[in-house]
Amino acid sequence: MDPNTPSAQPISFTASDGYLLRGFCWRHPDADARRPVVIINPATSVRCRYYARFAAFLHRHGFDVLSYDYRGIGESRPARMRHFEAGWIDWGRLDFEAALQYAFAQFPGQPVQVVAHSVGGFLIGLAESSHRVSRVFSMGAQYAYWRDYAPARRAGLLFKWHVVMPALTAVFGYFPGGRLGWLEDTPKGVVHDWTARHPRFEDIWRSGGARVLPDAERDELVRRFAAVRADTLAVSVSDDEFGTTSAIQRLLGYYRSSPRTHLHLRPDAIGQTAIGHFAFFHSRFEHDLWKIPLEWLRHGRLPPAPKGEVVALRAEAPGEPIPKPA
């Protein structure tokens, strides 16, 4: 573990299908039912260790924190990756659900909150118990619909992630991202889900795909998103080629019962040259950007005078029809 996070302890817990998941926990010695426990949902194929300094930061400010790796990644990697079966749906329905159950059992009565990066914000809605989450902070949260990629980078991203990545996956039985320096090695099911070209996420698992779910099961997934009522802050940055404003809004549309706030930042407005999709969780932002999630998780509000564009979306009434994202 990172030497600057001495309070982190290794943990393990089992998903409902028996798969063993591993991660780390930053826990205060005294129990306090008022203290929130924060679960960190990583981005696709990013190890939970990447968020260690951020987790330690939250711990120093009074939170209990749990980070973990999805099956196939980092601490939860199997002995053999070739043809290992795992997709986004497993990461959400099984792995994040298991993390929730671990938090409920280990921190009884404490509010459960989530910090989610990229696809981690999408996975929240797939879990059966996600309606019990009280607050969410997400950074660049989306599910990689290709038309939402930044226009200036779209062609290059399509070639890299929608042509080269699946081609290599077909050869190796998984995506060997580690040896290429393209994130971690990634299960083939996750590659399929990432490269599916559907504007609505539930259509990833329609007939003709690598994994097919019955219509009723896919409809149930959409209802799970609508059942989430967590106060949600979704942050996007102008130089994020994946988490564009359209991508963020597309995902937020599914969390229709949650009060949602979208904060869009420009690096130059906060004295930075770049932030992109990954740098938000770098420790150099501890004294500026990290104040945003800290204030949200503590009080459910933005810091005074945030240097960005703010869009608030109301929670919709239960009887309203589920909107169809464009």
Positions of predicted regions on the chain:
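Short beta-strand/loop motif that positions the catalytic acidic residue
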Residues: V228, A234-S236
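Alpha/beta-hydrolase-fold enzymes
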Residues: H117-S207
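N-terminal cap/lid segment of alpha/beta-hydrolase-fold proteins
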Residues: M1-D30
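Catalytic active-site module of serine/aspartate enzymes centered on a nucleophile-bearing elbow/loop
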Residues: T261-A326
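Short alpha-helix in the alpha/beta-hydrolase fold that links the catalytic acid
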Residues: A230, G243-Y254
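Conserved alpha/beta-hydrolase
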Residues: C48-R80
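Alpha/beta-hydrolase active-site loop
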Residues: E85-Q106
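Active-site glycine-rich loops that stabilize anionic/oxyanionic intermediates
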Residues: R35, I40-V46
